[in-house]
Every structure is written in C-alpha cells, then in structure tokens.
C-alpha cells in the first residue's frame, strides 16, 4: 500500500510532541476557521478531537502570501513555540507522557481503494502506527515499536493490497499459500534512543510562523502555525477558531525546479491516554515461514 512517508513523519512529530522537532509548530493567526472531515474515529484509544484554545502573540505583522497546488498560506508574523497553540498540545503530551492522534490522509490510496486512516500513538518510549480504511474498521497494517522490550513488529493484514501482493508473489513462485488467511508479521530490534522516541527534545523558544492556510479541497481557511526544518521543509499545523487542530500539512520545495509539494492529513482526534495493549503484537499473527510452504522441487 502506498503511504505518504512525509505526512506520517509530520504526524509522528505531532504525536511525539517534538521529539522529532524538525516538524512541530505553534502560533496564532486568523481568518475563518473551517473544518473538514472524512472518515471516522478509530477506536484504539481516542475519541475526542481537540487541541489548545489560546493563541500566541506575534512579533511582527507582515502580510505576504504564497500558494501551492494544494493550499494557500498567508504570513502574519512569528512567535515562539511556548506561546503557540501547538505548544499547548506539546505541554499536554509532556504532562501526560502519552498521546494518540487519528488522521485521515487526503490522498486517495488506489491500491486499497480508500483514503487511509492512520492512528499514531506514543506512550513512554513506545510508538505505534496503524493504517486502516477511511472509517477505521478494516486494518491494513501495524507498526509497533515496544520501548519496554526493545522489539519492533510490522504486521500486515489480509485485507490490505500489500498482503495480497505478497501472497500472489509467493504463489507464482510455486509456494503453497493456503495458510495465508491470517496476519503475518516481521520482528526487528528497536532502539528507542536511536529512533529519537523521547519527550525531552523540546525547545520552547523555537520560532513559529503565524498565518492562515486555505485548504483547496473545500475552501476552509485555518489559523496556521508553521515550523521550517534545517532542510527548508515546512510543517504546517492548521487550527479552527475554537483552537482544534484540523489539518497537518507537510510542504517541501524542490530547490532546483522550485516545485512545491504537499502532503495533507485531516485530524480526527487527539487524546492524551493510550492503552498499553496497543504496543503488543496481534497474537493471531504468524511469520511468513509459518504460513508459506516452499515448493518441493
């Protein structure tokens, strides 16, 4: 299944509350805070959709604008992360030591015939990512990094195009794949320190650009908070007038061509509690060696 690595990285940055803080933002901004939706909440650990309610003060007030193939932004000054809406999310994560965010990718997945829903969670040094269909009731894959056991698991489910592609490949190679009716998994070592799974890498004074972001799919205008990483990539956090986080946008610019590319996810919910069982591998999953019988000749 094709999955946007950039938007997953942005989402994880939000989930991990700047433990990958090349991708977290803050600020104020202003205009008509619209909302957009597709899909429903995933039942893993969260059901509310909220964020901060106060906005930061800006230190300047220019009003330039830029546009891309997906959205239009305006510039309304800068602030620091500590004074921003996103800073409120960060502080909630730091206070609780855990967070779960549910997103729906706005790019259609042709392989699985859906707008993928992603559930991303952090608890201590454990990280979880689930990809499902838009409504969240059909799971395609899970990525589990267990900070307590230092083990990682990737689990693929029979309902996914990826799983069926693997099954087809082994079948064409003469293997007996009759047992491939349950999830399969691969295990790998996980070092949370190397992966940056920490809530300590946090700069309250990080610069945040304030403004607005217009979502071209429905014309909604959001308060935007943008952080630019050392590579020039922008992570844009979009809030409605109530302070709820509605969109995560990752914007990159090709240095040679100047082409702007965006990956966008619709935020369905954020909560600050995560069920520990989320980080345990599905007991029904098997290894491929258990499910595949090689050809005899």
What are these regions (language model features)?
Residues 114-192, 246, 253, 260-266:
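An acidic-aromatic
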Residues 89-93, 117-122, 141-146, 206-216, ...:
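Short, exposed beta-strand/loop patches in secreted or surface proteins that constitute
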